[in-house]
Amino acid sequence: MKKEIASHLLEIGAVFLQPNDPFTWSSGMKSPIYCDNRLTLSYPKVRQAIAAGLEELIKEHFPTVEVIAGTATAGIAHAAWVSDRMNLPMCYVRSKAKGHGKGNQIEGKAEKGQKVVVVEDLISTGGSAITCVEALREAGCEVLGIVSIFTYELEAGKEKLAAANVASYSLSDYSTLTQVAEEKGMIGQAEMKKLQEWRKNPADEAWITA
């Protein structure tokens, strides 16, 4: 599963690896990887594989789920496809409440006491997913956990999720994707070394000259 999803993401260009020409994230951090899972929406076979995989993760880890919640905006489409496959209610959660109308942060129904699983496209530092979890908890829901398409496996993200006391499972991850990229000849040994060094300590830019 992890290798299959990693291959899909690389093949459609949803994930770029540029260890010799780093990306700059909005936080200002230099990174050898950039992930745009929104591209998966344009590839029916890929998005179907993702929906099936997310359904499998949910059934395995959170079998008592009653509602599927997507993170706005990237998680919404995947949450919709998964909820349709599982014949479950769906909602989505904004990063903050609307400034007009009813001022909703949660769109759709997620009622007090209901068991909810959050669908996210990407786990980086875990911030957006945790915002979603907190909003659902404030509404009285029992959040069983998070499922996502991909995770960078950053320690900062793992620590935040642990602090929020929420379980998280991803279809694929950084370690698997870089391995698949090397197997496909997309990166060489020197580039792999840089990718591995970044993974150990993303804040330390020494990996750029590794």
Swiss-Prot record:
Annotated binding of orotate, by residue: 124
Superkingdom of source: Bacteria
Enzyme class: transferase
Gene3D superfamilies the UniProt entry points to: 3.40.50.2020
GO terms of biological process kind: 'de novo' UMP biosynthetic process; pyrimidine nucleobase biosynthetic process
Catalytic function, reaction form: orotidine 5'-phosphate + diphosphate = orotate + 5-phospho-alpha-D-ribose 1-diphosphate
UniProt-listed Enzyme Commission number(s): 2.4.2.10
Chain's role: Catalyzes the transfer of a ribosyl phosphate group from 5-phosphoribose 1-diphosphate to orotate, leading to the formation of orotidine monophosphate (OMP).
Protein name in UniProt: Orotate phosphoribosyltransferase
Organism annotation: Bacillus cytotoxicus (strain DSM 22905 / CIP 110041 / 391-98 / NVH 391-98)
Gene name per UniProt: pyrE
